[in-house]
């Protein structure tokens, strides 16, 4: 069945898979100390225009990455501010709470939180005479793009980062779908901007062409000591770290990572036009690879027998919001088929 259920329904981009096959019989050191991990890290630093004080580590998945970064960067009395719809708050099974970190959710707007809202939260917190009895805000977590496919502007990121510095907090950007954010035609943010407007972020591989894996980037001087030890303690250090290094080495060769993002955006725009031309309504305006369509429940039942897509939320008693996602594996034939059945 043709599927638009997510951007990780297929395996790896052919160029990534070829690199894995071509290097398969090479004997390499373990735990991320191999030459491909080193090469990928240097390519990422170059793409981000970061210096020698930046640090890059590879972790197998997004939830592990969020949990490790957040739990190792915060002190025991600190929590993390996030949107109420943020992945760490809504869809990670309490992973950060499992390690003793409280999520401090703020009401988001289409998945985004504002610098003003964060600033007000912190002012209210420190203005409370009882704040020593409360969880301190120690970090702000955002996603780029958000769970709703929306993106922050460069000014919005800059304002958030300034508020974080004002209140002595770290800014962490979840880049699970980073390729689609930086390559969106509506975005004025590029990889180098991400690298200068936060303390730590990660470059998503799993949802952007890799079999699995994310690349954590500490932008300079704030990487926790003995980070490899901390990754292993949390059960997330691969013995065959080459699996991640080889993939990211391929993704950051000849601009493959951004090419994957551009292609998925092009497919998403075509998908969006197909629905719009047929008179369908959208839940919100998404400039990235995730499109949120409002379906009549009867039509939903018909379509789900013919094509895969993701449930998002109930819209009314008779309508539902569903998500259609594109990726490197989406084809023109997939779109033509979709057009023929909706």
Task: Cite the ranges covered by each PLM segment.
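Conserved N-terminal alpha-helix of the aminotransferase class I/II PLP-enzyme fold
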Residues: 13-62, 84-89, 95
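Conserved core of the PLP fold type I
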Residues: 54-74, 104-111
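Conserved PLP-anchoring active-site segment centered on the Schiff-base-forming lysine
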Residues: 72-90, 119
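Conserved C-terminal alpha-helix-loop-beta "cap" of PLP-dependent enzymes
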Residues: 75-77, 269, 274-342
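PLP-dependent aminotransferase-class I/II
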Residues: 100-138, 142-147, 152-159
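Active-site C-terminal subdomain of aminotransferase-like
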Residues: 109-110, 136-137, 143, 151, ...
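Catalytic PLP-binding core of fold-type I/II PLP enzymes
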Residues: 152-184
């Amino acid at each position: 069945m043709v599927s638009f259920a997510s951007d990780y329904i297929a395996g790896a981009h052919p160029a990534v898979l070829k690199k894995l096959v071509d290097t398969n019989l090479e004997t390499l050191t373990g735990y991320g100390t191999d030459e491909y991990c080193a090469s990928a890290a240097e390519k990422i630093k170059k793409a981000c225009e970061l210096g020698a004080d930046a640090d890059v580590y590879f972790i197998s998945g997004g939830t592990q990455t969020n949990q490790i970064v957040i739990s190792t960067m915060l002190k025991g009395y600190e929590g993390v501010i996030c949107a109420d719809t943020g992945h760490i708050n809504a869809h990670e099974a309490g992973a950060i709470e499992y390690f003793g970190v409280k999520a401090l959710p703020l009401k988001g707007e289409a998945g985004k939180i504002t610098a003003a809202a964060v600033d007000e939260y912190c002012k209210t917190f420190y203005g409370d005479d009882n704040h020593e009895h409360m969880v301190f805000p120690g970090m702000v977590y955002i996603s780029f793009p958000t769970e709703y496919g929306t993106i922050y502007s460069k000014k919005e990121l800059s304002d958030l980062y300034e508020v974080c510095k004002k209140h002595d907090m770290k800014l962490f950007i979840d880049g699970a779908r980073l390729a689609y954010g930086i390559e969106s035609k509506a975005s004025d943010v590029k990889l180098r901007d991400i690298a200068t407007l936060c303390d730590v972020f990660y470059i998503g591989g799993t949802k952007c062409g890799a079999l699995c894996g994310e690349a954590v980037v500490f932008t300079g001087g704030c990487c926790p000591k003995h980070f490899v030890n901390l990754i292993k303690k949390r059960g997330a250090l691969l013995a065959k770290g080459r699996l991640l290094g080889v993939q990211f080495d391929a993704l950051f060769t000849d601009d493959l990572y951004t090419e994957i993002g551009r292609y998925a955006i092009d497919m998403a725009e075509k998908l969006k036009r197909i629905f719009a031309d047929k008179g369908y309504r959208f839940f919100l305006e998404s400039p990235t690879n995730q499109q949120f369509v409002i379906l009549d429940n009867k039509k939903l039942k018909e379509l789900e027998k013919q094509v895969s897509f993701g449930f998002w939320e109930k819209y009314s008693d008779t309508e539902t919001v569903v998500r259609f996602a594109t990726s490197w594996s989406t084809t023109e034939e997939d779109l033509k088929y979709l057009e023929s059945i909706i």
